[in-house]
Amino acid sequence: MPWTQGESPLIKQHRKQSKRPYLFAYTLLFTVTALLVYSFYWMAGKSFIWVVDGWDQHFKALVYYSQWLRAGARSLLVEHRLHFPTWDFALGQGADVLTTLHYYAIGDPLNLLSALVPTRWMVHFYDIMILLRIYLSGLFFSLYCFQMKKQNGMAVLAGALSYAFCDFVLFAGVQHPYFINPRMYLPLLLIGVEKVLAGKRPYLLIVIVAVAAVSNFYFFYVLVLLTVIYVAGRLISLYHGEWRQMGMPLLKIAGASALGVMMSAVLFLPVVGAFLSDARIAVDQNSILFYPLRQYAYMPAEFLAHTGVSGYTYTALGFSVLTFPAVMMLFRQKKTNTLLKVFFVIGIGCFLIPFAGKVFNGFSYATNRWCFGLAFLVAYILVTVWPSFVTMDKRDCRYLFVGLSVYLVVCLLIRYSRVTQAFIVLGVLFAMLVLWQQRTKQGAGLSDTAIQVVALAATLLSVVNNSFWLNAYSGSNYAARFVDQKDLMQNFSATAENAVKAVAKQKKVTEFYRYTGHELPWNTDLNQHLSSLQYYWSLSSPQISAFRWDMNMREYLLYRYHGLDERASLTTLASTRFFVKKEKSKDIVPYGFSKVGTRVVNRSAVQNALDAFAEEQGTDKPGAADTKRLQKKVEKRYTVYENDYALPLGYTYSRYLPQAEYQKLSSLQKQEAMLQGVVLDKAPQHCASVQPQLTAQEVPFTVSCNSKDVTQQGNSFVVTKKDSSITLKLEGLSASETYLSLRGLTYAGTSEYTLYNDDETIDPLNRYTQTDWDLLPYNDRKKLKDDHWYWHEPATLNIKISAAGRSNTLPLSTPEYTWFSGRQDFDVNLGYGEEGVSSIKITFPSIGIYRFNTMDVVCQPMDNYADQVNALKEDVLEQIKVDGDRVSGSIQLDTPKLLCLTIPYSKGWSATVDGQPAELLCANTMYMALELDAGQHTVQLHYQTPLLNAGMGVTAVGVLLFVAVIVVTERRKRRDA
């Protein structure tokens, strides 16, 4: 091996050359396999950008990161200072660049290459990097095999392809490109461990720990757990329980790992700090003893084939065809490879038990993103057992025949494992069994080399088979869920922000502003460099999350939200100037926003369509009718509204509301109170507290069930047919916003079959009796029974609420939901109306019981709104300059006031007033404030990522220690040579 110590240069050169044929063979086979596996994307004209997180997060973050890197390099070349802005107002209302985008782009060392790629080619870079990560994961697996003295090239090739193209990669690797990274690091980490155990240099372990920690804090945690299990097993195996002998190797591994973490601290510390302060950490996720029965029903077939069970738990195995007989042969061999057997039993046990998935997920919810470790193990078992496929005798063949037959019967008996793709793989295995059986006859069958070639070909084809059933149109058509290559960059640029920018330009708006909208594409603000009220990144501000929780926003994810429910007061207090929506959308527009105009945001795409049609018809340009028809099909039209009461980035209060008094108010009272006084944790020196004048009123109503499929039972509604509805009759207030306020809202679902159990709790009107059941056709009864057997409660529901031609949706999650936050209190804005609302319709989407503690209708008169906002606008921050992580402005005050800055609160911000340090207060839960005396003031704000300086210091010490380790180690090696 290239790393072997004590060898002459000639021997080292020979070892390097001996691996070149393998490298060539692996590269060739990988290329062929990748072309076949991903051909379904290319034939469909698809990129590897998933339409959900791939498009909404990963790709947009990568484009931003490449521009961010170039901006930093430009600052060095032009300004002669290296400066990377660490704050950007285009991350929602504003967020830390390093900690927010680390998970998506910044952590991956390979993404540094993006600085060299123009934005127009970024989609190709994105796709190529996915293939490169997969290639490297298989290559590094091969290196581990060689480190462990596995010298059969075909065996290692089969294992590498199995590891590189298992179902986890086919499914999750293109969804989330950085899920592939830990697959690259794991074999290198284990090689590093093996080197330390062999008394060799620890450099590789130190460097890979540093790279893994920098790359992704989440998967670094997973890698640590996997490595700890591996090290424990290897130490016990090597030293046979002699605990004293284990101490020194364990100390060396721990020391090398700690040094690697120190070297990574420049990014690792800030990101971990942000993670530990994230609102999701405080959420007590629901624990379950077992997965839903349906998930277990998929698992037999999932071992060898893609079944579609993956979902949010990433229960994705889909190993290559020979891994199943390899595992069988492993357990057939007595008193050998004991550690592999133990690891396999542990791995399968963890795979079956949700608590293990919870542990691997940082004690959050249960998910199996760690199963790449199981894929590594199974692929290595295949490499280890491979020689048995050449030396197999009749008893081995009978043993495999019985095992495969049992596996076949299990798949046939279980509904969700009764899938074609599994039977195809089993057919290949039985065919292989025939070939092995033939070889047991004297002088018959294929040669040793030929049988290995056939086995390797079967491995490759089984991977392609899994890809077919996952990606092909005739299979699950998974590739259809990815973004089209054609016009991708045009669509990337043609966003609602173009309409906002056009209106801002028309209005000659030069100062800082924000925009908002409902159901806009996620994170388009980032690449358009506009600040907005939408956000969808994994790490979020705990202050913003707390604020939205206080306001009972209608959302069930703490880190993904659109706007502020179009509530006028909150939207204005957030310095929002524009509201944008699709032209024909019926989205609620906040009170006080006036229509400015409608803009087409994709004119280039429209022109391309017109040019293509003209060329097809052989004319200079389409006729008027065709032009109108094509425009109607292609145009993306957005309507922009401007806030008549817009507030700037900094506005002032003359009074404050103590946090303790604020918390005594209801959520709707809180939003009204914030128009009258800024909410502070501590009393300012020169401003008095306020006693807010609250005008919101609860309105009495009566409930009418619109059919016998929904029944009111006290504080609950029992629904026996989906999409059943109720109507609230009331006399709402005029010139008011109207809210439906729900407290303690929960849902308990039931299957349709259960309705026939004569249980008045779920069927209070006895409409589903035994007689009704007996009258159902046999096929209907059979289907209801089968569905009930695998039924589990819906994880999310969308309750539709409408009034006066306006509608809103209340998304409700249950404890079954992977990211259940525990939120049960909601205030749903039904918009502003000059006339009072007379009825509210609530539509329940699923069968079950909807319970609540209280349900109220609240009207918020807007009579005082204009005066309250204008009072905040009397004295504002002017001449505002926003330059990444620096904000400055000036203000003139006649009396002492509190300057509220609508910048999300963070300890990374510092302020000076007239050149003197000033204390930044947390204001209105999520913003910042400065207490100012009367007079003219210059305000300057500066941001630096929390713990970044500390991380730099630790990294510097770590690098120096690493250099010292190298010097000491090499001197010792030369001395001992």
What are these regions (language model features)?
Residues 1-43, 248, 252, 432, ...:
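Start-transfer (signal-anchor) and selected internal transmembrane alpha helices
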Residues 110-115, 528-659, 663-672, 676-700, ...:
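A cross-kingdom signal targeting lumenal/periplasmic-facing segments of multi-pass membrane
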Residues 56-59, 63-68, 72-75, 249-253, ...:
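Periplasmic/ER-lumenal interhelical loops and adjacent helix-loop junctions
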Residues 91-93, 99-103, 461-486, 502-574, ...:
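Extracytoplasmic/lumenal acceptor-recognition loop(s) of multi-pass membrane glycoenzymes
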Residues 33-141, 161-183, 275-280, 288-310, ...:
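Membrane-interface coil-to-helix junctions
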